Amino acid sequence: MKNQTNAAQAENPLGTAPVGSLITKFAIPAIISMLVSALYNIVDQIFIGQGVGMLGNAATNIAFPVTIISTAAALLLGIGSASNYNLEMGAGNEKKASSIAGTGLSTLIISGTILSVIVLLFLKPLLHFFGGTPDVMPYAIDYIGITAIGLPFYVLSTGGNHLIRADRSPTYSMACILAGAAINTILDPLFIFGFGWGIKGAAWATVIGQIVSGLLIIFYFSRLRKMYLDHSMLIPKARNLSAIFSLGMASCINQVAIAAVQIVMNNTLRHYGALSAYGSDIPIACAGIISKVNQVFMAICIGISQGSQPIWGFNYGAKKYSRVRQTYRYSVTLCTVIATIFFICFQFFPHQIVGIFGNGSDLYFHFAEKYLRIFMLMTFANGIQPMSACFFTSIGKARLGVIMSLTRQVLFLLPLIVIFPVFFGIDGVMYAGPIADTSAFVLAVVFARRELGVMKAAEQNA
């Protein structure tokens, strides 16, 4: 049995192929999938901004916590099951790995359906809690009242793609998300401008795209999968859920923290904006735009992390620590280069970036450009924290993964958003961003260096 396990490890390219080529193979599809997934929100924001205006942009920002919370459920189950699958396959436990994948797949469908029902039942109080103003609420209700219908498919496609990548089919994973986003992009202008449906048209375009992506996920696992999976494995098992939650919790908590920050920020902007020359709606709309722009950057960094995830997990399970360390260094370097490019764009071209999302008054552009420059000041260092969270999760260090996920959003940014505006008004929200980013970066470097040092020592003593 031990010889069979060693043979399986030796045959798997995750343990033998050059790290650079492996990261390219897995990261590029993951990056494209993450970017395309982000486009579901960004494309809507662009067309809504052009067709509906500032209040439409504000409405999508108020509705955005629903998407973030749904993403949290998808990552909890998708990353949790994929991480466990990779670890068990690396250790040669194929049957156990498949059982975990089956539980993850079925619970993705169940959780998405539950979320859809909850949002539709409590739509108005949720949107008010998320920071809706009287002028913005009608648009937000129209938008999220429709997009909630597609949540089961969104959760399935977002989480299921992690399992497909773990099943060594990164290209198909990319195609699933790409197909849905392409349909969304085509239907957005048709529904918004051609049919004159406004923000409702953007919502229906999003739902149809999500349904297509979800159906492609179902087709893969019913016809094209490489992993062994029978119907009995689709019945959720408590022991599998425990393992999935353990390794998926870091990414889930990170998304929940993002949602919490978004909600607190919206309400803070609503309150302090009303006390400023900008009013409430301009800051909320601008914050939504900057949030969507940041999604593009984070999609690339998280895509690199997700592409590295199976390499980290397999080699850690196989005790090939030098490959784990090499993969981490390569990924961090790549992410930092990309982050620096985004930093330059944010600092030198804020007007052009904001202008993509529609026209507005001089006051609107003044606030948006200032917000983008200040809040995103530490972009060049922002990729290390989410990458380290994914790294610790992939090697089975769930507790450290959770800590890394919480540092920026909960430990630093959330309290700063509450405290700074008391002293600096609405500008305090902007300055909270770079201070939180710097603090999270330092903490991530400390934890990662310590873990890599432990691996190096274990390798030398082996």
Model-found features: residue ranges?
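Short alpha-helical transmembrane segments in multi-pass integral membrane proteins
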Residues: 1-27, 85-152, 194-249, 312-378, ...
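N-terminal transmembrane alpha-helices
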Residues: 14-51, 65-80, 84, 109-116, ...
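Transmembrane helical elements of multi-pass membrane transporters/channels
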Residues: 25-44, 146, 157, 180, ...
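Transmembrane alpha-helix boundary and packing residues in multipass membrane permease domains
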Residues: 30, 34, 46, 50, ...
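Helix-terminus/linker motif at the lipid-water interface of multi-pass membrane proteins
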Residues: 39-57, 127-134, 190-197, 259-289, ...
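Small-residue-rich hydrophobic transmembrane alpha-helices
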Residues: 57-117, 154-173, 266, 284-350, ...
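Hydrophobic transmembrane alpha-helices of multi-pass small-molecule transporters
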Residues: 69-72, 184-188, 214-218, 296, ...
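Short runs within selected transmembrane alpha-helices of multi-pass transporters and secretion channels
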Residues: 78, 147-165, 173-181, 202-215, ...
